[in-house]
């Protein structure tokens, strides 16, 4: 076996190859989605220690219930729905919970009506997608989903109003997406809502829409959420009308509403350690020993990742596939409102998209070692090479989208959110990517030429 065959490569995953031999796809779009993403997905499951039965089950469910809702395979010269999920507008993303070695994925459900006159703002596809997931997991509860869906996304009349009045413009058109946490032989579903279009259609602010919908949730199902919600509202109001932080989206667990967590996400344009400290402490409101201990860890992560300080704005457009990013995105935070906690619990996001991936990898590896996550520290860099064996590992700056951190009961939680498209041997096996190759493409042309020789 040659040295090329011995190098890390997700396309060599045994489970991916077995399933590729036996699975059938109704069309070429779904087949391409499978071969583009499944190598990385299968390898990530293996690396995280999922047993072989779980790996087959997870990939089988993804093929059956998720791939059909990813829409046409993305190219630069074909029409497609652009999702806010990634800067390239692609509707699927894998992430890794580093502390628990758990895999999760997020996707924006898309169907044939998405973006057409029947559903110009992709309001409807998520219903069909959720129905599929509920058939596979009867524990999925949609009561809270129905509540936020009605309050934060446009209905048919509002959709028509947006079209007729041309109010959508360049605003975010993604309204909802789903995420699956893969654990205990099954999955837990979360839903995310972006109220930007609802705000445009109703004239109400995003902040008002989100907070009022949570107040209704408190009154109907979760009175114990009133206290953490009050603290968060006070913080947002205290930041003032000129604040660089603003509410962006909301998420909830699709479980019994009385036990479900709700998360409110803020975008922070000021990229600095001081801004992140303010987000973490809620402007000094979180003063517990645990919160302050975590603050030291956040400073440590900041010193390792070294995001360049700036005042950043989230771009209104999307990057063409294959573009090398040259941008710094804003920071982000979510505040979890729990029925058993009077204080909102923050999870901060280091926006690493556009930063050198080798530098980020080395920073994460150092942090893993300090946390005692030895196995992950030893394997993380090789795993990334396996996911993208034909990328220039020295110069790539598009693989790590976010690194998130939270801290609960003395335990650090970190997740990484990774670019998930055209993994493994895709660049040398399937032609759609080749037509976009240029000297600036993240795939190293010398390696590509060598592989194709």
UniProtKB/Swiss-Prot annotation:
Arranged from A to Z, the UniProt key words for this protein are:
Transferase
Quote the pathway field. Answer: Alkaloid biosynthesis
Q: Which reaction does it catalyse?
A: L-tryptophan + dimethylallyl diphosphate = 4-(3-methylbut-2-enyl)-L-tryptophan + diphosphate
The residues forming a coiled coil are none
Q: Which GO terms describe its molecular function?
A: tryptophan dimethylallyltransferase activity
Pfam families tied to this protein: Trp_DMAT
Is this entry keyworded Transferase? yes
Q: Where does substrate bind?
A: 104, 190, 192, 261, 263, 265, 347, 349
Q: State if Transferase is listed as a keyword.
A: yes
The domain of life for this entry's organism is Eukaryota
User: Which residues does the annotation say bind L-tryptophan?
Assistant: 84-85, 93, 194, 248
Annotated GO biological processes are: alkaloid metabolic process
Knockout phenotype, as recorded, reads: Abolishes the biosynthesis of communesins A and B.
Give the enzyme's EC designation: 2.5.1.34
What is the role of the protein in this entry? Tryptophan dimethylallyltransferase; part of the gene cluster that mediates the biosynthesis of communesins, a prominent class of indole alkaloids with great potential as pharmaceuticals. Communesins are biosynthesized by the coupling of tryptamine and aurantioclavine, two building blocks derived from L-tryptophan.
Subunit structure as annotated in this protein's UniProt entry:
Homodimer.
Q: Which family does it belong to?
A: Belongs to the tryptophan dimethylallyltransferase family.
Name the record gives this protein = Tryptophan dimethylallyltransferase cnsF
The major lineage groups are: Eukaryota, Fungi, Dikarya, Ascomycota, Pezizomycotina
């Amino acid at each position: 076996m040659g040295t090329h065959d011995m190098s890390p490569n997700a396309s060599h995953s045994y489970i991916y190859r077995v399933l590729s031999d036996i699975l059938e796809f109704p069309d070429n779009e779904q087949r391409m989605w499978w071969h583009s993403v499944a190598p990385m997905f299968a390898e990530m499951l293996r690396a995280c220690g999922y047993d072989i039965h779980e790996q087959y089950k997870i990939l089988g469910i993804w093929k059956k219930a998720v791939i059909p809702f990813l829409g046409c395979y993305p190219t630069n010269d074909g029409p497609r729905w652009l999702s806010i999920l990634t800067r390239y507008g692609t509707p699927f993303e894998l992430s890794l919970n580093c502390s628990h070695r758990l895999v999760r994925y997020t996707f924006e459900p898309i169907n044939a009506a998405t973006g057409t006159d029947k559903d110009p703002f992709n309001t409807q596809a998520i219903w069909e997608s959720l129905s599929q997931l509920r058939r596979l997991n009867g524990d999925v509860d949609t009561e809270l989903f129905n509540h936020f869906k009605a309050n934060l996304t446009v209905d048919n009349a509002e959709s028509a109003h947006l079209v007729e009045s041309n109010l959508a413009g360049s605003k975010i058109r993604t309204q909802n997406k789903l995420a699956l946490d893969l654990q205990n032989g099954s999955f837990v579903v979360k839903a995310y809502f972006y109220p930007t279009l609802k705000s445009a259609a109703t004239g109400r602010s995003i902040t008002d829409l989100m907070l009022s919908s949570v107040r209704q949730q408190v009154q109907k199902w979760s009175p114990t959420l009133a206290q953490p919600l009050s603290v968060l509202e006070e913080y947002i109001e205290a930041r003032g009308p000129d604040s660089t932080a603003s509410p962006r989206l909301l998420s909830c667990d699709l479980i019994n509403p009385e036990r479900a967590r709700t998360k409110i996400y803020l975008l922070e344009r000021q990229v600095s350690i001081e801004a992140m400290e303010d987000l973490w402490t809620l402007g000094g409101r979180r003063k517990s020993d645990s919160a302050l201990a975590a603050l030291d860890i956040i400073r440590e992560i900041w010193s390792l990742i070294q995001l360049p300080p700036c005042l950043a704005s989230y771009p209104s457009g999307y990057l063409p596939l294959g573009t090398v990013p040259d941008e710094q995105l804003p920071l982000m935070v979510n505040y979890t409102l729990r029925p058993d906690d009077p204080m909102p619990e923050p999870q901060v996001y280091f926006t690493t998209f556009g930063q050198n991936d080798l530098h980020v990898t080395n920073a994460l590896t150092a942090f893993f070692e300090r946390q005692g996550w030895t196995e992950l520290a030893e394997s993380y860099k090789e795993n990334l090479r396996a996911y993208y064996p034909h990328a220039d590992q020295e110069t790539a700056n598009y693989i790590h989208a976010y690194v998130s951190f939270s801290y609960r009961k003395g335990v650090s939680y970190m997740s990484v959110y990774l670019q998930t498209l055209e993994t493994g041997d895709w660049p040398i096996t399937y032609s759609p990517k080749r037509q976009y190759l240029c000297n600036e493409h993240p795939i190293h042309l010398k390696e590509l030429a060598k592989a194709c020789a």
